[in-house]
């Protein structure tokens, strides 16, 4: 491995608490983090370091599991173990809680905005995925509840350009949803993992989906058209096994370089690179860079910067955020 993953900065983002998730705003000027302390922190770059700009701590009664920026960057959604999702509106340098989305019976595990910004998806330990629509008056309405999983739903992610949604679950499966006659339904179930699927990420084109699991593997799924007017199918074209020592909690496909990064329960951060000479229907990924003890505890999340190639952040059970620079020798 000639490629490098260098630590730029490490800071205690959520003291005495887990840092569950980090998310860049679309411009990459702000980073939101959330944790077991019920707080959301907004970080901005000051010179070469990242400083806390504001703390949002009145929205939730329990841990905040995930945060997500709207495509326009003016709204932040937060999903909490208190079974609610808060929508925060950015006003100058501050944020106000605009509305609270209620309805899930148990912890909300994830929230994600559609690329249009007009729809939002949430998922929960109650085994359901909810689709919400937002109008020009910032009113949110649940338009569909899908119960395609048989266990706790861990993560939801939207296709980068289409109104297509994917979710993954404690039931070991991935579901892909499309809207049909004003209702959302599961159009494909991706089976292959042997334990909980924790995270999902689309490649920049949206033609492939990567999943990561408690079975310590990463799977790459490719969309294929069966023809004859049938539904699109997703086929597993590659499995990365033998690289991770414990559960793989999160995975992120770099929108700029196509590199694939993982966050793992063995405290490591890894970056995989695709062999561009390989057959697209049989892709080959190699381990490009690995920091074995990126954090002193489980790594929960990994996120590539949307505008700066090679810049990525990770966060951990020890409350820390780490900023990394990945450099690949072509």
Swiss-Prot record:
* Entry's transmembrane regions: none
Question: Does the record carry Ion transport as a key word?
Answer: no
Any one Gene Ontology cellular component term annotated for this protein: cytosolic [4Fe-4S] assembly targeting complex
List, alphabetically, the Gene3D superfamilies matched.
Answer: YVTN repeat-like/Quinoprotein amine dehydrogenase
**Cross-referenced InterPro entries, in alphabetical order?**
CIAO1/Cia1, WD40/YVTN_repeat-like_dom_sf, WD40_repeat_CS, WD40_repeat_dom_sf, WD40_rpt
Q: Which GO BP terms, alphabetically?
A: iron-sulfur cluster assembly; protein maturation
Q: Which Pfam family would be a valid example here?
A: WD40
Disulfide bonding pattern of the chain = none
Q: Which UniProt keywords apply?
A: Repeat, WD repeat
What are the WD repeat spans here?
A: 14-53, 59-98, 103-142, 148-187, 192-231, 243-282, 294-330
Question: Which PROSITE patterns does the entry link to?
Answer: WD_REPEATS_1 (PS00678), WD_REPEATS_2 (PS50082), WD_REPEATS_REGION (PS50294)
Subunit record text: Component of the CIA complex.
Similarity-based family: Belongs to the WD repeat CIA1 family.
Q: Which PANTHER family match?
A: CYTOSOLIC IRON-SULFUR PROTEIN ASSEMBLY PROTEIN CIAO1-RELATED (PTHR19920:SF0), WD40 PROTEIN CIAO1 (PTHR19920)
Briefly state the protein's biological role.
Key component of the cytosolic iron-sulfur protein assembly (CIA) complex, a multiprotein complex that mediates the incorporation of iron-sulfur cluster into extramitochondrial Fe/S proteins.
Protein name (record): Probable cytosolic iron-sulfur protein assembly protein ciao1-A
């Amino acid at each position: 491995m000639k490629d490098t993953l260098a630590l730029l900065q490490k800071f205690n983002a959520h003291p005495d608490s887990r840092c569950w998730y980090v998310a860049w705003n679309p411009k990459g000027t702000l980073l939101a983090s959330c944790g077991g302390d019920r707080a959301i922190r907004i970080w901005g770059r000051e010179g070469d370091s990242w400083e806390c700009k504001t703390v949002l701590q009145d929205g939730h009664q329990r841990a905040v599991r995930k945060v997500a920026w709207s495509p326009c960057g003016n709204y932040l959604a937060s999903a909490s173990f208190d079974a609610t999702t808060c929508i925060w509106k950015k006003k100058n340098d501050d944020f106000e809680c605009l509305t609270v989305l209620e309805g899930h019976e148990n912890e909300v595990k994830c929230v994600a905005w559609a690329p249009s910004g007009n729809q939002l998806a949430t998922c929960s330990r109650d085994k359901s995925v909810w689709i919400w629509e937002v109008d020009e008056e910032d009113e949110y309405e649940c338009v569909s509840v899908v119960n395609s999983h048989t266990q706790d739903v861990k993560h939801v992610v939207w296709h980068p350009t289409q109104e297509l949604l994917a979710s993954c679950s404690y039931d070991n499966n991935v579901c892909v949803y499309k809207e049909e006659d004003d209702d959302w339904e599961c159009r494909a179930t991706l089976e292959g993992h042997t334990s909980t699927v924790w995270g999902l990420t689309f490649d920049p084109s949206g033609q492939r989906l990567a999943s990561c699991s408690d079975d310590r593997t990463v799977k790459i799924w490719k969309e294929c058209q069966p023809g004859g007017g049938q539904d699109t199918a997703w086929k597993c074209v590659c499995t990365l096994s033998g690289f991770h020592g414990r559960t793989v909690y999160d995975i992120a496909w770099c929108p700029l370089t196509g590199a694939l990064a993982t966050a793992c329960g063995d405290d490591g951060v890894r970056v995989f690179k695709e062999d561009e000479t390989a057959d697209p229907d049989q892709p080959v990924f190699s381990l490009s860079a690995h920091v074995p003890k990126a954090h002193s505890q489980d790594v929960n999340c990994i996120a590539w910067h949307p505008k700066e190639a090679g810049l990525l952040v990770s966060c951990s059970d020890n409350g820390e955020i780490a900023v990394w620079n990945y450099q690949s020798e072509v």
